[in-house]
Amino acid sequence: GIPYWTYNNGDEPLVAISLLDTSNIANQLDSTPRVFYLGGNPEVEFPETQEEQQERHQQKHSLPVGRRGGQHQQEEESEEQKDGNSVLSGFSSEFLAQTFNTEEDTAKRLRSPRDKRNQIVRVEGGLRIINPEGQQEEEEQEEEEKQRSEQGRNGLEETICSLKIRENIAQPARADLYNPRAGSISTANSLTLPILRYLRLSAEYVRLYRNGIYAPHWNINANSLLYVIRGEGRVRIVNSQGNAVFDNKVRKGQLVVVPQNFVVAEQAGEEEGLEYLVFKTNDRAAVSHVQQVFRATPADVLANAFGLRQRQVTELKLSGNRGPLVHPHSQSQSN
């Protein structure tokens, strides 16, 4: 679930061997290996896995939850979304342009529909990247390991009988992320509600105002169950092959299951907002947002990976990065 890229800055070809540990405790899906690409039009690395998933996708076409609203729009967009094998190819160019506050051409390049370079991209002139010193990286790693080893040993351990068992994450003042035009996000995990450590669960409360968007993101170490408590909106889920396995309207009382590492985005409707709870199967569930990944990725890497001009990279990293909560109309007005 952690995005990464590799660059050979040597004078000789590099052969890398990757070991995929599907039995890792962080993997909550199954023993089937999956590779999720954010960019490019990669070749299929596990063809037997894709064939099996495509058969299921053709049989179900989408997750059997709630009404299948917006079917006409889904059919119109299906042709565009068939191109490309990256996770962003499962979203329409129009939606990506709204989410990242970019031009239509930039959004189309993010989907990489006709990119023939597959997984490996040749960089002309080399990459210009600022790297931290090796000693600094080692010190940061040692500090992280020290903090992990000290977790839960503060001398004031809570007993089962005295554990706090209730937390109101819907309070406005409790919000962890807030956009006055788009909405708010609040989370509860074992750090804020320690009893969740025994249940191995965490929760997220999302409130989206009209037309508000929760930009594409994925859960690194948990499956999740989305339950709509108010309003209506649209949810899109994309798998490792770039297929939109779910793209439907959701309403109050409906459930949607989002598998680990599948990219998901939500948008409230035009008439009313959308409020929902997300229950996650990890007491410290971690979320990665595509926008944050773009901002943390060196400009030269983005330019070469997506075939972008420098102006488009700047637009993507800065103008289009205002947090995971987005209101498309307010962004376009501010430009």
Curated annotation (Swiss-Prot):
Residue stretches of biased makeup (Acidic residues): 135-144
Protein name: Legumin type B
Parts of the chain that traverse the membrane: none
Superkingdom: Eukaryota
Keyword terms of this UniProt record: Disulfide bond, Seed storage protein, Storage protein
UniProt function note: This protein found in the seeds of many leguminous and non-leguminous plants is the source of sulfur-containing amino acids in seed meals.
KW Disulfide bond (keyword) present: yes
Residue stretches of biased makeup (Basic and acidic residues): 105-118
Subunit description: Hexamer; each subunit is composed of an acidic and a basic chain derived from a single precursor and linked by a disulfide bond.
GO MF annotation: an example: nutrient reservoir activity
Pfam families according to UniProt: Cupin_1
Similarity comment: family membership: Belongs to the 11S seed storage protein (globulins) family.
The species this protein was found in: Vicia faba
InterPro entries for this protein: 11S_seedstore_CS, 11S_seedstore_pln, Cupin_1, RmlC-like_jellyroll, RmlC_Cupin_sf, Seed_Storage-Functional
CDD domains on file: cupin_11S_legumin_C (cd02243)
Signal sequence coordinates: none
Domain Cupin type-1: 167-314
PANTHER family cross-referenced by the UniProt entry: GLYCININ G5, OS03G0336100 PROTEIN-RELATED
Region (Disordered): 47-87, 102-155
